[in-house]
UniProtKB/Swiss-Prot annotation:
The gene is ptpB. Its EC number is 3.1.3.48. Belongs to the low molecular weight phosphotyrosine protein phosphatase family. It catalyses: O-phospho-L-tyrosyl-[protein] + H2O = L-tyrosyl-[protein] + phosphate. Dephosphorylates the phosphotyrosine-containing proteins. It comes from the Bacteria. It holds the Pfam family LMWPc. Signal peptide: none annotated. The active site is at residues 7, 13, 111. GO terms for molecular function: protein tyrosine phosphatase activity. Keywords: Hydrolase, Protein phosphatase. This is Low molecular weight protein-tyrosine-phosphatase PtpB.
Amino acid sequence: MRITFVCTGNTCRSPIAESIAKKMLVDDTINSRGLFAIDGQSVSPESLEVIMEHNLPEPTVAKQFSEKDLNSDLILTMTDMHKQQLVSHYGDNGRIYQLSEYVGEIGDIVDPFGGSIDTYRQTFEQLLYLIGKLRTNS
């Protein structure tokens, strides 16, 4: 299965999700994208620090979501707003979900941008929990 995680800039939440999923969902192809990403931008230092603390695979550099990404089997967004923006722009293809919604939970993944390293660690724990449920459900 090809899974694409989506956030705003593809430098904080979705790269963390990508790294966790690459470790947990080894039989799947994992990508991350941003709705307003600057192609080639590095992952935030704090996100990278949290990823390295857990010895996870390093994520790819930022890449903006494009029509090609609609070929993913599953597109999982960090917030309901991200989901709504994708559906509004590309239509509802039945494969776009908010991550928490897809695994039977409620709520957005908090954007840690501009926060302390502890905020990034909290985001990591939230994503670890949800992706753990994703693995269990797949």
